[in-house]
Design a protein with these regions (language model features):
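Conserved class I S-adenosyl-L-methionine
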Residues: 2-46, 62-66, 89, 166-173
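A short SAM/SAH-binding and catalytic strip from SAM-dependent methyltransferases
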Residues: 120-133
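A short glycine-rich, Lys/Arg-flanked "PGG" loop and its adjoining helix->strand segment in the class I
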Residues: 134-146
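Core SAM-dependent methyltransferase catalytic element
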Residues: 195-234
Length: 234
């Protein structure tokens, strides 16, 4: 489905997030982001000390405390974001906390290459804000080790009359803040290319965490066709 913000240029998206970088805490409150949502999503990554994780759309680093606790000081965290304003706040956070194992990059996530194979990838409230989300997901899969896990945490429109009632306001609010599209179905995209897919919903279906693993062994042959499978799921 096409929406008026789906063709936003990178510069426009980056500029919008530069402007709202100081408001992310307020926006979490405005959208009723569940209190333990971020910690729960990171838990679903199944990270162990010393592992390597990439957060796509890392923003101001609000997930970094949970990621750092999971991988420890010997692990490695990579964060990529289009917005310099967001990354400036993330760098400041890392400086205050003296986290030296977090590497940040201002780049399109569909082009960013982590310097080493990844154990896990997190889309932290970012998947539905990227017009080219399918390309980003496919690119993330290529960087993930076999058996590595991808987690997508995001918001969606609840089913039923409640969802229909709040949809017009939700779309208006997204256009004026995060530029996201809550009508896409990332869980279908991930389920099309991942093993052991699971999904949980929160706050009457307004928020979800879904996860799955990159296929291993004999199933690896399916991965060259991931692009086609993703398009079919769209």
């Amino acid at each position: 489905m096409s929406h008026q913000w789906a063709d936003c240029e990178r510069a426009f998206i980056a500029a919008r997030y530069d402007r709202i970088a100081g408001l992310i805490g307020f926006i979490d409150w405005l959208f009723f982001v569940p209190r333990h949502f971020r910690a729960h999503a990171v838990k679903r990554l199944g990270l162990r000390p010393g592992q390597r994780v990439l957060e796509i759309g890392c923003g101001t680093g609000r997930n970094f405390p949970y990621l750092r606790a999971a991988v420890g000081p010997q692990g490695r965290i990579y964060g990529v974001d289009l917005s310099d304003g967001m990354l400036a706040k993330a760098r400041a956070l890392c400086g205050r906390e003296r986290w030296t194992n977090i590497e940040l990059a201002q780049e399109d996530a569909a082009e960013y290459m982590a310097p080493e194979p990844l154990d896990a990838v997190l889309f932290g409230l970012s998947y539905n804000t990227m017009p080219h989300h399918l390309a980003v997901l496919h690119h993330a899969l290529k960087q993930l080790r076999p058996g590595g896990r991808i987690v997508i945490m995001d918001g969606k429109v609840p089913s039923g009359l409640g969802g229909k009632f709040i949809l017009p306001f939700g779309l208006w609010l997204m256009r004026h803040t995060m530029l996201g599209n809550p009508l896409i179905k990332p869980w279908q995209h991930l389920a099309a290319v991942a093993d052991h897919f699971e999904m949980e919903q929160f706050v009457f279906g307004s928020w979800y965490v879904c996860w799955g693993s990159k296929p291993t062994g004999a199933q690896m042959g399916a991965l060259p066709y991931a692009s086609e499978r993703l398009i079919a799921a769209e």
